[in-house]
Amino acid sequence: LNKENGQSFIENLGLAMEDIYTNQRELLEQATLQDRRKAFQFAYLSLLQEENIQANHQITPDSIGLILGFLVQRFLEHKKEMHIVDIASGAGHLSAAVKEVLSDKTIMHHLIEVDPVLSRVSVHLANFLEIPFDVYPQDAIMPLPLEEADVVIGDFPIGYYPLDERSREMKLGFEEGHSYSHH
């Protein structure tokens, strides 16, 4: 696909998921949430061999999602419904792994991601997994359009902060070029 449309492998992975949940419903309905999430993870990790990606486009490892899911389950075991905010959500893999652990709960996921490519991929992932994600394509350090959250999770990015003008206002921002997001 990337030779046909000139988009990156990550963007085309989103388009491939869109095709599956739009045109191949029978295939999708045969798979469990875990099967679909692992298929996404495998495809994402496979594309890393094809394309050099920036560090902040890497997905959160399963172990982090499973541990966070376990902690949320232990601390909020009395809640049947909850709002989870994922700060710097990337492609949404962390929220998907947490949902897998909390499968018996009704969760409204609010994903905050400044990178437009990753925001779009997380929308496709939500549809592919059939998990309700509200994706906010904005900077997590700006005021959030949320009124409530029971839990805030996040796997903070390593790499470049994409908003050069905003980073120049920060103490650790570079005067020229991209600043690091992890400073």
Annotate the PLM regions.
Residues 21, 44, 75, 136, ...:
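Sequence-level detector for tyrosine residue identity
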Residues 155-183:
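Mobile active-site "lid"/loop adjacent to the S-adenosyl-L-methionine
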Residues 56, 75, 100, 125, ...:
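Generic preference for flexible, low-structure residues
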Residues 1-101:
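Class I S-adenosyl-L-methionine
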Residues 1, 8, 138-141, 183:
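Secondary-structure junction/capping motif
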Residues 8, 32, 60, 104, ...:
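Serine/threonine-rich low-complexity intrinsically disordered regions
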Residues 64-65, 69-154, 159:
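Conserved S-adenosyl-L-methionine
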